[in-house]
Swiss-Prot record:
Binds 1 divalent metal cation per subunit. Can use either Co(2+) or Zn(2+). NAD(+) binds at residues 68-73, 102-106, 126-127, 139, 148. It comes from Chlamydia pneumoniae (Chlamydophila pneumoniae). Its cofactor is NAD(+); Co(2+); Zn(2+). One of its GO terms (cellular component) is cytoplasm. It is found in: Cytoplasm. One of its GO terms (biological process) is aromatic amino acid family biosynthetic process. Zn(2+) binds at residues 181, 243, 259. This is 3-dehydroquinate synthase.
Amino acid sequence: MMSETIITTPHVVKLISNFFQKKLFSSISTAYPLVIITDVSVQQHLLGPILDHIKMLGYQVIVLTFPPGEPNKTWETFISLQYQLVDQNISPKSSIIGIGGGTVLDMTGFLAATYCRGLPLYLIPTTITAMVDTSIGGKNGINLRGIKNRLGTFYLPKEVWMCPQFLSTLPREEWYHGIAEAIKHGFIADAYLWEFLNSHSKMLFSSSQILHEFIKRNCQIKAAIVAEDPYDRSLRKILNFGHSIAHAIETLAKGTVNHGQAVSVGMMIETRISLAEGVMKTPQLIDQLERLLKRFNLPSTLKDLQSIVPEHLHNSLYSPENIIYTLGYDKKNLSQHELKMIMIEHLGRAAPFNGTYCASPNMEILYDILWSECHVMRHC
């Protein structure tokens, strides 16, 4: 496989064996500087050969970097990068390429959408999370005053180029974090993917064929949802399953919990809410979800995050009141006092709720489930 186009709508996604293909860059003009956005970790470990190849093709390349990690996906980083684009006098006809994980792609997408009202955008994801989730669908965001993705836009890339070889540089834990989003895709929309993950959990790390099928299936699931609802008004909301709780965890834990870990716990809690609300009728699905998460060394309870979150943040995180207050900032809400949440109907199907795909949880049920999670922690 040199290059396989696995998605054409809402934007092109190509699965490639390497980047040393001249035709890959054929749609990008050499008449204007090519801007690359990445973090310092990717710059040190992956960027060199790609940069040499791009320069060999005749491009003038400007590389802008920022420190890695979610805590740096901030307004301050965004403005600093915008200033650098202005200082370099980057033309509106220049293309911008984001190379990295979810944080880099979020930041690059927001930069591309806002600089000169839009630069041609290309994305090169280097992590599982970025390949199966962040790079698909054109949604981007940065954090503001510690609130997850408070600022953002919908801005589609021209193309996304995925090279699974990049994943060989990742520690196994990074793979696991990305697989949380894949488990979500199976849970809300595709029972086949769910069974695929159950059947191929070990081969995923050793078989390139299985890995390619895994990436392809996830991209196609998300792309189909986005194509039907590009602006997050109805069906696309189901992609937020597990994320209401997850974003509250990430906010209260001050970025010390990885997004995949937070989504993993968020899915478990929101599944319990779905059952308690009577939306889901199969209690065994909770155990099935937990077993699959554990197979990939993912947490399933707030208690599982105890060793990750610094002790001085425990009182903040392990408080039902704090979690509910932080849920008030979730973008699905109609107001801070009218929470909205995605719920599961059965395996492979999120509850439609008459086409809104989200509903207000019973606050007593929500509090009781959060209290049971936090109460265990307070008595450890």
